[in-house]
Structure formats: structure tokens, C-alpha cells
Amino acid sequence: SDERSKAWPNIKASRQDIELSTRLNVESYLHTLKAIVPGMIKRRKGHVVLMGSLAGLYPQMSTVYGGQKGAIHRIAQSLRIELSGSRVKVSEICPGRTKTNFGKAAFTDKNKAKKFMSGFTLLEPRDIADAIMFALSVRWRSNISTIEISGTEQSPGGVPIIPDKDPILS
């Protein structure tokens, strides 16, 4: 079967999968921002950290997921402009493949999930936490806008350097 996944759907994605992943990957961010940003503006202090993805910055075989994460990238950029002068910072962390449950949740085919998350050293959740802490640690006059972080065996965009090792491409 050519069914790639639930969370990495291409044009064969079901309407239900697209709607569910859009609620998770875009709408939840917007609702959370609506809830927390006004208080930060009022206090004239705060730091919004959005979790993007390299899939949102670089074209990959993930039309829906990549598009949703691309929306997060644009939201982060636009929010930073909207909050200019408010003393509220906005940072976006864009990781590549990371050792999480994403592969299990994203793929309906367990073998593809395992293959997707193997063949090279993945980032650890701690690597992402360190990137977040770095963004939060800079002085008030500085803002880290975007951090791209991938494993050393991944090329820009998070796709493995050797394409035949990528289950999406092979």
C-alpha cells in the first residue's frame, strides 16, 4: 500500500486526518497565543516559544504536515512584528527528527515508523530543551527568532544526507 502516514499525509490524506492535524498543529497554537499573549503585553514582559519544524522551513514529502509547520513559522514571524515594542519576545524552535513518539503516532505502518526513526542518530528531547533554554537565556535586548536544529547526519531540512535511507523518499 502507498499509504504513507497519518501525520505526514500527502494528497492522499483523508479529510479527517487533515482536519485533526490542522487543529493540533495550527489552531491549538492560535488559541493558546490568544489566551497568553494579552497578559504578557499588559505586564510588558514575556517570551513566546513556538515549536516549529524543519519540515515547515524546507520542502519535503510532507505536504500537509510541512504546510502546517510552515504556518507556525509564519505565525511566529508575524507575531514578532505584531508584538514589536511590547517587550514580549517570540522564538521558534525548528527541530529535525527527534527521538519522540512522533514516528509511532505519525505512521499507520509500524515498519515505516521504525524505518523513519532509524538509520542515523536522532536528536534527543534534551537537545530541543537546550535550544529552548538558549533562546530564553539571552538578555532582554536580544531576541532569538528562529533556531534550526538537526542531527549531524541530516542535511538542511532534516532529510538524511543519503536519500535511500529515508523511508519517505525510498
PLM-predicted stretches and their roles:
Residues 38, 81-84:
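Alpha-helical segment proximal to the catalytic Tyr-Lys
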Residues 33, 68-69:
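Active-site helix of classical SDR
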Residues 8-9, 13, 59-67, 78:
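Active-site loop-to-helix junction immediately N-terminal to the catalytic Tyr of the SDR YXXXK motif
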Residues 92-93, 111-158, 162-164:
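C-terminal helical subdomain
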Residues 4, 8, 35-44:
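A short helix-coil junction within the Rossmann-fold of NAD(P)-dependent oxidoreductases
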Residues 53:
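Residue(s) in the substrate-gating loop at a strand-loop-helix junction
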Residues 11-30, 45, 49, 72:
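Catalytic Tyr-X3-Lys loop
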Residues 32-36, 75-76:
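Hydrophobic positions on the long internal alpha-helix
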